[in-house]
């Protein structure tokens, strides 16, 4: 058990003296220390696979920001490589994926091919016993979107057409990806992850009807299987939160990580659920006065006896100022629960 178990106690609904805080993409390009380490390797994927460097990066936010949890440094796309997908990160362009496009050509997932991820979890836990370690994976639909689009997309037209016009192939691919993510997260839990988070970054492009039909059954199965496997807390992050919240609360997730399209204090009035979030990241471009106003404005409205974790509604951006991120973390940590 980590010395600072605020995150775990909050997710379990136990008494806490203050709200726990960590940030998505808390170890990233906005940190000079990260950039120095990044320059020691040729590309981003190599960095993800270098256990020593990835461990060092994972630990940076604890040392520099004093966050209440460490999320391991990795990427949601790495479990696609064992399926036979070529994954590249092109500087200035982001991820590029290539495969035959035939679902039947995908290999059966072998978790051992992502052994470096599990080793990073072990190393981070060996290096510190201060805070919990969070493992993570991309959700099946978000991974499918990358596969069908060949990378990031503005409109996800190809994904939607594949989903609507090839329902049998869509189901086959989603089944494969769901079992892949399940096996991958089970290995992270076995390696010692104290919490796991599932990132559904692209579902905000779907209608409520399509989310219910094409996403919900797979996420529901995935989270249920994880909860049957272990009592390790599960957090589900999904963009477009206001559209899908009524469905997402039915998941067995310990907390839903939501974007700024919803009002968390209001959610606590309606649902008996844990929530994480949801300060709009753009607030960090503003002055410290605005950061304080927006942050305290949220925290003051959160009921004390609730399962709540402070985070952003999405990840930190590369051009954000480290000092403002530190100011935000200190602000949350200094907010007393009375």
Swiss-Prot record:
Residues with site note (Transition state stabilizer): 75
Known EC number(s)? Answer: 4.1.1.37
Annotated GO MF terms? uroporphyrinogen decarboxylase activity
Q: Which UniProt keywords apply?
A: Cytoplasm, Decarboxylase, Lyase, Porphyrin biosynthesis
Give compartment(s). Answer: Cytoplasm
Primary residence? cytoplasm
Q: Which Pfam families match?
A: URO-D
Residues where substrate binds: 25-29, 44, 75, 146, 201, 314
Keyword Glycosyltransferase appears in the UniProt entry: no
Q: Name the Gene3D superfamilies for this protein.
A: 3.20.20.210
Kindly list the biological process annotations in GO that this record carries: heme biosynthetic process; protoporphyrinogen IX biosynthetic process
Question: What does it catalyze?
Answer: uroporphyrinogen III + 4 H(+) = coproporphyrinogen III + 4 CO2
Keyword Zinc part of the UniProt annotation = no
Superkingdom: Bacteria
Q: State the signal peptide span.
A: none
State its role: Catalyzes the decarboxylation of four acetate groups of uroporphyrinogen-III to yield coproporphyrinogen-III.
Q: How does it assemble?
A: Homodimer.
Q: Which family does it belong to?
A: Belongs to the uroporphyrinogen decarboxylase family.
**Protein name, entry field:** Uroporphyrinogen decarboxylase
Q: Could you tell me which species this protein originates from? A: Aquifex aeolicus (strain VF5)
């Amino acid at each position: 058990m980590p010395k600072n178990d605020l995150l775990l106690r909050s997710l379990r609904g136990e008494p806490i003296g203050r709200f726990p805080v960590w940030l998505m993409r808390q170890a990233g390009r906005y940190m000079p220390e990260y950039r120095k380490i990044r320059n020691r390797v040729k590309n981003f994927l190599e960095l993800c696979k270098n256990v020593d460097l990835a461990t060092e990066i994972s630990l940076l936010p604890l040392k520099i920001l004093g966050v209440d949890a460490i999320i391991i440094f990795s990427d949601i796309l790495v479990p696609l490589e064992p399926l036979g997908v070529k994954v590249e990160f092109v500087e200035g362009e982001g991820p590029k994926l290539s495969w035959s496009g035939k679902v039947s050509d995908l290999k059966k997932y072998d978790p051992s091919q992502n052994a470096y991820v599990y080793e990073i979890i072990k190393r981070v836990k060996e290096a510190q016993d201060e805070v919990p370690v969070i493992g993570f994976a991309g959700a099946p639909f978000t991974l499918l979107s990358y596969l069908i689009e060949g990378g990031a997309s503005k409109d996800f037209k190809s994904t939607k057409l594949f989903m609507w016009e090839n329902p049998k192939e869509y189901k086959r691919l989603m089944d494969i990806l769901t079992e892949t993510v399940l096996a991958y997260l089970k290995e992270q839990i076995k390696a010692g992850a104290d919490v796991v988070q599932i990132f559904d970054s692209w579902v905000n492009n779907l209608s409520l009807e399509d989310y219910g039909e094409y996403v919900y059954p797979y996420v529901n199965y995935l989270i249920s299987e994880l909860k049957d496997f272990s009592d390790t807390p599960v957090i589900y992050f999904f963009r477009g939160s206001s559209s899908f919240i009524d469905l997402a609360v039915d998941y067995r997730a310990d907390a839903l990580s939501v974007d700024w399209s919803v009002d968390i204090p209001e959610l606590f009035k309606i649902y008996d659920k844990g929530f994480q979030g949801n300060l709009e990241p753009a607030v960090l471009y503003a002055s410290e006065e605005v950061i304080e106003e927006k942050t305290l404005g949220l925290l003051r409205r959160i009921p004390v006896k609730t399962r709540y974790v402070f985070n952003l509604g999405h990840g930190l951006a590369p051009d954000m100022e480290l000092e403002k991120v530190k100011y935000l973390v200190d602000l949350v940590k200094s907010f007393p629960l009375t």
